[in-house]
Each structure stands twice: as structure tokens, then as C-alpha cells.
Amino acid sequence: MRIETTILGNLLLNEEYTRKVLPFLKNDYFTSNAEKTIHETIGDFVTKYNSLPTKEALSIELQEVKINEEEFKETMELLDDISKDTEEYADLGWLLDSTEKFCQDKAIYNAVVESIGILDNQKSSQDKGLIPE
């Protein structure tokens, strides 16, 4: 099981975990579009209703997301996998530590990729002076 799956599954099941980590999880940290869609939809639901979505509620919300049919199918398959794989709570301390490390690693990775893009002039709106020494 990947840490992304564990994170998303616990966002659905563990309210204490969700309230602690959701403000720090960015969509950019997730690799697949399905993971990004589920993360964003959970975040929107929690913001709107101040509670965790059930699998059924999330499924209904996902039907409203503007994605193509193939992405929708992948997203629903991932949701099913997450629901099956995350049937019990993991230790909160371990979850928080693992999620913090995941966020740090992804933030560093994204910064390196963006810096390479700036150096390669792929992003002409960014100045090379933005890269820290």
C-alpha cells in the first residue's frame, strides 16, 4: 500500500487526523489525477459540511466533478480500493509522522522540479533569482 492511499483512506475515516492534516495537504503532493480529485473533493466536503464524507457521499460528490469518463472510472476504482484497504484506524502518531514526512518530501520534490523548470527557461514568468542559493 502506498502512503497516498493510507492518507486518503484516513481522511475518510479518522476525523482527528483529517482536522490536523487537511490544512497542510496540497493537491500538488499527489501523483495521480484520481488521488488529486479525491483529496480535493474530501477537502471541499469538509469545508462545506464541517464533517467527514461517507464513501457514498463522496461517490455522489465525485459525480459532480468535471472530469472525463476514464478519469471518473479511475477515481471510483481508487475510492473502492481506499475503502477496502483502510478499514481500521492506524496509530495516530504514526499517521501524523508519516504524513508530515510525505508532505516534506513532496514539497522538496516539487521545489526541485520547479527550479529545474526555471533553469531550463520553461517558465518564462519566473526569474532565476527566485531559486535559493
Label for each model-derived stretch:
Residues M1-F102:
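Noncatalytic partner-interaction/assembly domains of nucleic-acid and motor enzyme complexes
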Residues S83-E133:
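Interdomain "pre-motor" coupling segment immediately N-terminal to P-loop NTPase/helicase cores
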